[in-house]
Amino acid sequence: MVWTKYKLMPQDIAVYLFLENASHKRENEILSDLFENHNQMIVWDYRPDYFLLKRSVMDLLNLYELDDREYHEAERILLEISQKGADSEIETDCFGAYFKLIWMQLTYSGISYRKIKLRNLLRDFNYKRRTAALMNRMNLALNALGLKMYLRGYEKCDIRDAGLDDMIMIRLETKK
């Protein structure tokens, strides 16, 4: 069973589209493809209704594109009308959000892999030590999203066994 926290939420999609700086046409293509071909990756609440998903993502994109003054004004208005719900939940699993972004980049940006040293990945999340529990959480996120890790030479590896200074490549799982 894949946990809901490893499913794409409107926030994840909006962050990807914002960082990608895609055209409106490309945004619609990505949303449409996600809904039609990767529906199982979307959180349950948005699976049956494409327009609900699209509206939620576009509302978030509109907020992300505001400047500071406009953002604070919009935030105040939203608080006044109490339009704060499940979409504003803060995700506590930083690895889930990070690997969901990588999944979207690998699926839609035309790149076939992302590479990083495990030491840098841990440093970016402010971890000083590599514990078994931490590696298991990372591994769970990778497996839930269908991401595989490789060393140089396309050699499969498990994140728990990789060395800190090994260059790790993250790729989409190939379907057979």
Each model region followed by its residue ranges:
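Charge-rich, solvent-exposed alpha-helical interaction surfaces
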Residues: 12-18, 29-37, 56-60, 73-80, ...
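C-terminal engagement modules used by replication, chromatin/transcription, nuclear envelope/ESCRT
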Residues: 149-176
